[in-house]
Structure formats: structure tokens, C-alpha cells
């Protein structure tokens, strides 16, 4: 297989794009570095495409490795023919390669191998030849041998049938045909195994064609089966498939047709069907997991790239009942100022005392915003806060923060290192406050799998999920850029070219030498060599550096070009520092000529111009601002037809959940997102979007809210 050609076809890219991107990856360059600083070589492929290409490259190389292993194994048996080698070369998937290898794979002792040990292979060959002199029984008499355990003619025929059944099940072309037919006409079927209510009730008597099986339903059935509520199986059109096999394998003039029909039925029911069922279910699950990981990736990307609410003093409230609500007041830089615990919720209900304490904190520190975690007791805490805010003269608003993962962080080694003197619960409160001020900087401290914006994330391959989500975090961190002098080791470890040990060395260097004053100073950090510097330098910013270009996303390798461009346009570095640079595109007549003159490509020229005009620009500024509230709404207040503004909290295969401020997210089904047909909600909306929705229905008993985004 020509891997480069395959990548070209699958990604719709040119030969040079494929060759250059693969070469850059093989040279050890990181995805963010390639996407940002090697655009001329990749044809400006973005980080998501390059990451997908990298994953596909690994998969295709693994496929080639397996092809080589199989070819070697067959050759060592002395059974590799030209036809077999050609078949192996033509195989496009792992399944096809394994089908070809199946007859040659070392097997455990089977009914067929036992029959072969008894000397019945020649009889099997006679029956398979389908031309007899006399009857099958007469042919079988010669193989009766009590010493071999073949006591009767029937024993001989049955043994030969076992050999042929396995032989048929090992036919790669036949397996491919049956697999394709099953997928085309078969169904996934689930039945209940327990006569009791559960979240899987819709699957208690469920059937869906395989070619239409939705990924989220496949994963739901898998979970229901794992938890003991469902039995799940693949059903093919057995009679139709048996007829196809008979037409393919039995000649019209066959003298052994009746025996072969029995062989075919046994081969299909005992060997082929169970094997195909496992393969098809594994394939369905793998595809469903990949789709779910894709949604999780996009949700995580949008969550991490939520705009920070900067410059505000935040009072964070981590709700609870018996143990009280943990409070942390955090200044505009994220530094905790004071922590305490109040008890406004049941069973203590010390509302007046809690109110007095929090109002005092609001006045003492000039609190601008209250961040309330959305976990246990969140609703009661929100009601308490809304009432309390009516009693302060300051303009204070509140926001409901997604606290998923806060408890994981607070109990982690990282949480203990950051706040060794704080109780675990108070660390959670600090995290809830900080993730409003700068979601990216805070959320990188938490395992992405714990952030809770995916479907069935605990049911899938955790290694694959971890790799995929880690890539998303890396891309987000590098697209925003990191302040070298303030970033935590957790944030630094996601910067291109920097791993956890180097991140700690950067922190150690800061502690020993004070703030970095220039990017090139990074080369003095232990274990950070020239290659790592090349990868990370452009993503690390120094807002106070005397070198204005250190404050931007311009890579040090392009400083000379940037200064040359400034000179051509009548500017200097002082203008960059003073943010006076503008209209560069109008000042150069030909981008191609200017780029050539500066020794760079046009894409790099365009990136440099953007950075010089808006040094240190945060791409998150373009996202819609979070919805802040000052009063509370309850489900009982909702009326059919009411139009509200909300924030998309989660995107899943069948719709989106929207926070409309009633503590119970409403569901916009995929059919209610827009007037045009969409295959997936992500085609029209993403996590963090601020949207207008209309209430379709409210079920107070089941706590369900149905919303629409159509006709507003």
C-alpha cells in the first residue's frame, strides 16, 4: 500500500502536502508547531487536520506492519504463493488481512484438527470434490478404523464434515461476502434480561438495521448489556445467506450435495455467524467510539476556548448540604484572598448567618461576580445567592459554573502541591472560581476525561480517549499562547515541545532567577535544548519583555523578517510595543514579492502582519461572552412558547443541552436545531454558544424541558 497516496486520497490533499507533513512529523515536530510555523510546507493545513493525519498515518503503518508479519508467517510455513501474496497486497483493512491469515494461523485443538489426526482429510477432499463412484457411505467405509477412534461410517462422514466446515469458515472471500451481506441486510437486536424499570427501557425489545445503527444507540446497548439489563445480538438473514453459500459452493451435478448442505449449515451457524457477530459488533463499537470521541473532542475544544472573564474579583461557592458551602474569594489574577464555609442549605439552614458573612466579603474585597458550582445543592445555593444580591448596593452578578472535575483536581497531587495548606473542599472552591476567570488555565489541571462533556466516555478505550483529548488540550493551549512568567507547570506541560519534567524545570528557573526577560533565556533551562526551543518558543509570550516581538506569536526564527517588514512599512519595534502598527496589508503592493524579499512564504507573512497589528491577541475574545445572571428562574416559571437566552452546555449525537437558568438543562432535539437537515448537531451549534430558544414543553415530574431553536 502506498501510504502517502492513501493519505492524499483520504484527506483531499496534494502529494507535496502529504509528503511534507509526514516528513515533518517523522522529524519529531509537534502538531501545533507544524500547523503554526510550517504553513508553506503543509499548504496551511490546520492543527485538527494534521492531528487526524498523524493518527491515520500511525494506523496505516500499523496495518503495513501486520501485513508484513502475516506474509512472513505464511512464508515460514512454505505456503506463500504468488496469488496469496497479491491478495495480501490488495487487502485494505486489518479484517481482510486477518481473513487471509485465518487458514494459516496456529489453532487450538478443534473438531476439524481432531478429525485430521484420525486421517479423515482425504475423505473430506473426496466429498469436497463432489464426484463419487458409488455413495458417500461407500467412500467412507475405507476410513473406518477403530484404532483411530473412527468406529463407524457415520463417524467418518461426521469427521470429514467437521474438516470441511472449518475449511469453509476459513475462506477469506466467502467471509467477506457474508460480512458485507450481514451488514447490508442484518440488524442489531436487543432484549431485556430483567423485568424491571431502567434507563434502557427503549431497548427492551429493540431492532435497528445495521446500516442505520446510530453510534450513541450502539454504545447505550453495550452499556445496558454490560450492566445486565440487556442481551444484544446481531441477526443476519440466515436462510438467504445459507442459499448464497450453497449456490457458491455446491455444483449442480454434485454427488455430495446433501452432505455439503449440512456442512454449510454447520459451518455458518457454529463457526462463521458467531465469529462475524463478534467482528461486526467490535466494528460497530469502534466506529461509535470514534464518533463519540469526535464529539467529545469538539465539546472539550469549545469548553477550553471559552472566553475568560478577566479583571473581576470572584467569590466562588462550592455548594453542599450537610458539610456546608465552601467559599473562596479570588482576586483578578486568580490569587485566593480568603476562604470560609457557610451553611445556608439544609439541614442547617443558617441563611441569615451565611448572608451576613458573604455580604461582608463582597464589601471587603469588592466582589464583582459569584461563581456557583453546578453540583449537589446548587439549586438551593442559587436561590440563596439571588436573594442575597438584592441586599447589596454593589452590582454583583452570578454565573453557574460547570464544576465537573473540580473534586478530582482538589484531591490530586497537583492540587495538594498548589494549595498544601487548604482543605480538599476549599481547593474545589478555588478551582470553581478560577475556571470562570480563565477556563483554559484552570481546566488543563484536570484529566480531560473528568471534565464531563462527552458521551459514554467511561465505556470506551481509555488509552485512545486519553490520547485524543490530550491532543485537543495541546492544540487549544498553543492556539491561545502562554505567559511564560505566570503559567503553571500544568499549563506549560501542554506547550509544544515541553513535557512535565521541563515544565517543572521552567518553574524552578523562575524561582531561582526571577522572571524571564527574553525568550532566548529558555535555552538556559535544564533539559530544554535547541529542538524543544524551536517547538515551544513561538507559543510562549513575555508581555513585559524589552523585545516587543517576545510579546507576540512571531517565532524567533522570523524576527529578522518581522523587523524587515516593519522597516518596509515605516514602523519600528517601538511601534509594536505601543500597539501603533496598523494597515500593513495596504502598505505592501505585492505579498508574494514582499515575502520573497524577506525570505519567508506568504502564509508566514500574513501571520506576522496579524501579530504585529494585534500583539498578544487572545483568539478567545471572538467567542460569545458567558451569560451572567442576577435573578433566578424555576422550572415552574416556564411556559410553553416562552423565549429565553441560554448557553449550550453539552452537544451529543441526538441534540444539545442548553442551560436556560433553571438548574435543569433543556434538550433541543437535533430535529429542532435548524430548518435545514443536519446529520449532527455540531454542523449548526457548538458547546459554549449563546443561543435563543423557545420552550416546547415542560415535564415537572420527570424534570425534562423540551426546547426548539426554530421559528424564533
Where are these regions (language model features)?
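C-terminal accessory/binding modules appended to enzymatic or scaffolding proteins
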Residues: 12, 307-308, 474-508, 630-668, ...
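Accessory alpha-helical DNA-binding modules that contact the DNA backbone or grooves
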Residues: 30-31, 42, 46-147, 479-622, ...
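Low-complexity, acidic/Ser/Thr- and charged residue-rich accessory regions of DNA metabolism proteins
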Residues: 139-147, 151-153, 206-207, 242-272, ...
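A glycine-rich phosphate-binding loop feature that marks nucleotide/adenosyl-phosphate handling sites
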Residues: 179-188, 317-321, 375-377, 401-408, ...
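Long, charge-rich intrinsically disordered scaffolds of nucleic-acid metabolism proteins
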Residues: 96, 399, 405, 410-480, ...
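Long, charged amphipathic helices and adjacent flexible linkers at domain junctions
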Residues: 279-297, 450-481, 596-640
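Duplex nucleic acid-engaging cores and interfaces of nucleic-acid transaction enzymes
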Residues: 49-52, 59, 63-316, 320-410, ...
Amino acid at each position: 500500500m502506498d501510504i502517502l497516496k492513501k493519505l492524499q486520497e483520504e484527506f483531499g490533499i496534494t502529494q507535496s502536502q502529504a509528503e511534507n507533513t509526514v516528513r515533518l512529523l517523522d522529524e519529531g515536530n509537534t502538531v501545533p508547531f507544524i500547523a503554526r510555523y510550517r504553513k508553506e510546507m503543509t499548504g496551511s493545513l490546520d492543527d485538527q487536520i494534521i492531528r487526524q493525519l498523524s493518527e491515520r498515518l500511525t494506523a496505516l503503518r500499523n496495518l503495513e506492519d501486520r501485513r508484513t508479519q502475516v506474509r512472513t508467517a505464511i512464508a515460514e510455513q512454505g505456503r506463500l504463493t504468488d496469488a496469496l501474496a497479491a491478495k495480501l497486497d490488495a487487502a485494505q483493512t486489518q479484517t481482510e488481512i486477518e481473513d487471509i491469515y485465518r487458514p494459516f494461523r496456529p489453532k487450538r485443538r478443534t473438531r476439524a484438527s481432531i478429525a485430521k489426526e484420525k486421517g479423515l482429510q482425504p475423505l473430506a477432499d473426496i466429498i469436497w470434490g463432489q464426484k463419487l463412484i458409488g455413495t458417500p457411505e461407500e467412500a467412507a467405509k475405507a476410513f473406518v478404523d477403530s484404532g483411530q477412534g473412527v468406529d463407524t461410517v457415520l463417524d467418518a462422514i461426521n469427521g470429514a464434515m467437521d474438516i470441511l466446515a472449518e475449511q469453509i469458515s476459513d475462506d477469506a472471500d466467502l467471509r467477506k461476502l457474508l460480512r458485507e451481506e450481514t451488514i447490508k441486510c442484518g440488524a442489531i437486536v436487543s432484549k431485556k434480561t430483567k423485568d424491571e424499570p431502567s434507563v434502557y427501557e427503549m431497548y427492551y425489545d429493540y431492532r435497528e438495521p445495521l446500516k442505520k445503527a446510530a453510534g450513541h444507540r450502539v454504545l447505550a446497548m453495550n452499556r445496558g448489556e454490560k450492566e445486565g439489563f440487556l442481551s444484544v445480538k446481531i441477526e443476519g438473514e440466515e436462510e438467504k445467506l445459507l442459499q448464497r453459500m450453497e449456490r457458491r459452493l455446491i455444483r449442480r451435478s454434485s454427488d455430495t450435495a446433501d452432505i455439503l448442505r449440512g456442512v454449510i449449515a454447520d459451518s455458518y451457524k457454529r463457526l462463521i455467524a458467531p465469529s462475524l457477530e463478534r467482528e461486526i459488533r467490535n466494528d460497530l463499537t469502534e466506529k461509535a467510539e470514534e464518533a463519540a470521541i469526535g464529539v467529545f473532542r469538539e465539546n472539550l475544544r469549545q469548553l477550553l476556548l471559552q472566553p475568560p472573564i478577566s479583571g473581576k474579583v470572584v467569590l466562588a461557592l462550592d455548594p453542599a448540604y450537610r458539610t456546608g458551602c465552601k467559599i473562596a474569594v479570588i482576586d483578578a489574577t486568580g490569587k485566593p484572598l480568603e476562604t470560609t464555609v457557610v451553611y445556608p442549605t439544609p439541614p442547617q439552614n443558617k441563611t441569615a448567618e451565611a448572608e451576613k458573612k458573604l455580604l461582608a466579603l463582597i464589601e471587603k474585597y469588592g466582589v464583582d461576580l459569584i461563581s456557583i458550582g453546578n453540583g449537589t445543592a446548587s439549586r438551593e445555593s442559587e436561590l440563596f445567592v439571588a436573594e442575597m444580591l438584592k441586599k447589596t448596593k454593589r452590582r454583583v452578578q452570578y454565573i453557574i459554573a460547570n464544576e465537573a472535575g473540580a473534586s478530582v483536581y482538589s484531591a490530586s497531587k497537583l492540587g495538594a502541591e498548589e494549595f498544601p495548606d487548604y482543605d480538599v473542599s476549599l481547593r474545589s472552591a478555588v478551582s470553581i472560581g478560577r475556571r470562570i476567570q480563565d477556563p483554559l488555565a484552570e481546566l488543563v489541571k484536570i484529566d480531560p476525561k473528568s471534565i464531563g462533556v462527552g458521551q459514554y466516555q467511561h465505556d470506551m478505550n481509555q488509552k485512545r480517549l486519553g490520547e485524543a483529548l490530550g491532543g485537543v488540550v495541546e492544540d487549544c493551549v498553543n492556539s491561545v499562547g502562554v505567559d511564560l512568567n505566570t503559567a503553571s507547570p500544568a499549563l506549560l506541560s501542554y506547550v509544544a515541545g515541553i513535557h512535565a519534567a521541563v515544565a517543572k524545570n521552567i518553574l524552578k528557573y523562575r524561582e531561582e532567577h526571577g522572571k524571564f526577560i527574553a525568550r532566548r533565556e529558555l535555552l538556559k533551562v535544564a533539559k530544554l535544548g535547541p529542538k524543544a526551543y524551536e517547538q515551544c518558543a513561538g507559543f510562549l509570550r513575555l508581555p513585559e519583555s524589552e523585545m516587543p516581538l517576545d510579546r507576540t506569536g512571531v517565532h524567533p526564527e522570523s524576527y529578522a523578517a518581522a523587523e524587515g517588514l516593519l522597516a518596509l512599512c515605516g514602523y519600528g519595534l517601538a511601534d509594536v510595543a505601543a500597539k501603533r502598527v496598523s494597515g500593513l496589508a495596504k502598505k505592501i503592493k505585492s505579498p508574494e514579492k514582499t515575502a520573497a524579499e524577506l525570505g519567508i512564504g506568504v502564509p508566514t507573512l500574513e501571520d506576522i502582519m496579524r501579530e504585529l497589528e494585534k500583539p498578544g491577541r487572545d483568539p478567545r475574545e471572538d467567542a460569545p461572552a458567558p451569560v451572567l445572571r442576577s435573578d433566578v428562574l424555576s422550572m415552574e416559571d416556564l411556559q410553553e412558547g416562552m423565549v429565553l437566552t441560554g448557553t449550550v452546555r453539552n452537544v451529543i449525537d441526538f441534540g444539545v443541552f442548553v442551560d436556560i437558568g433553571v438548574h435543569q438543562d433543556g434538550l433541543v432535539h437535533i430535529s429542532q436545531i435548524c430548518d435545514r437537515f443536519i446529520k449532527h448537531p455540531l454542523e449548526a451549534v457548538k458547546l459554549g454558544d449563546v443561543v435563543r430558544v423557545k420552550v416546547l414543553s415542560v415535564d415537572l415530574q420527570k424534570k425534562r424541558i423540551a426546547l426548539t431553536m426554530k421559528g424564533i
